[in-house]
Amino acid sequence: MRLKNIHLFLIILAILSGSAFAKEVNIYTSRHYDSDTVLYENFTNETGIKVNIISSKSKALLERLRSEGENSPADIFITVDAGNLWKAQEYGLFRKINSKKIDSIVPKNLRGKNNEWIALAKRARVLFYNPKKYSDDELKDLSYEDLSSSKWEKKLSIRSSNNLYNQSLVASMIVKHGESFTEEWAKGLVNNFARKPQGNDRAQIIAVANGEADLAIANSYYLGLMLSGKKGEKQLNAGKKVKILFPSQND
């Protein structure tokens, strides 16, 4: 997280923890980063409020919150992807956040329609390509919409449509272009698959590195994870063979 986001996180945590006299705050989170742990520790050091963490996958936490109902000890739910926020809203798990302080530091487009949630960070769903096959100049104007073109027939790699990241990408297309356009776009996208969807985001990047596909759709931060070497030599070597492209930059 950037320094600005760290300060924002601590402010929000303080506000959402309730009373300034609260002795502890219970957080259900699907995030699993060391940086978050440091933030919680800093919060406790600054406020004296203990942070209790329940960590699991978003789906499991959502079901737990539903089953606990009004008796849930959770004060804050931290998840990833707007799709999970939508599910939580459908389940009626959120209540409106009334805070002029939060309203002043979090832009309206990064808050729920009725202030039932706020965004702390954004993820980028981008394209990966082999620079030995394509130059930066060749792809600089590429958009998400272009991916359904016959030019990319049998050249795309992407994980299953069951994945929430892909569902959110489709949702963004519907918001921008409407359902009819997006349906035709999705059909073209499927026709351009280089292989049957399989594996996680890193598997798509590896497919490009190995020459199984020309373009992969995946979240940007996975390349950083691969290049860190923490996931083994195979992923490190694959990460070195690809480059990131942020599509639709002319929009």
Question: PLM features: residue spans?
Answer:
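Extracytoplasmic ligand-binding site segments that recognize negatively charged/polar headgroups
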Residues: S30, D34, P73-E212, L223-G229
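Generic structural signal for residues in well-ordered beta-strands
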Residues: V51-I53, L156, V242-I244
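Short helix-capping segments at alpha-helix termini
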Residues: E46-T47, S180, E233-A238
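Bacterial N-terminal signal peptides
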Residues: H7-S17
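Extracytoplasmic/periplasmic substrate-recognition and gating elements
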Residues: G199-I206, E233-D251
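Residues embedded in well-ordered beta-strands
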Residues: N26, V126-F128, K243
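Positively charged n-region of N-terminal signal peptides that target proteins for export
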Residues: M1-I6
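Early extracytoplasmic/lumenal segment of secretory-pathway proteins
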Residues: A22-K87
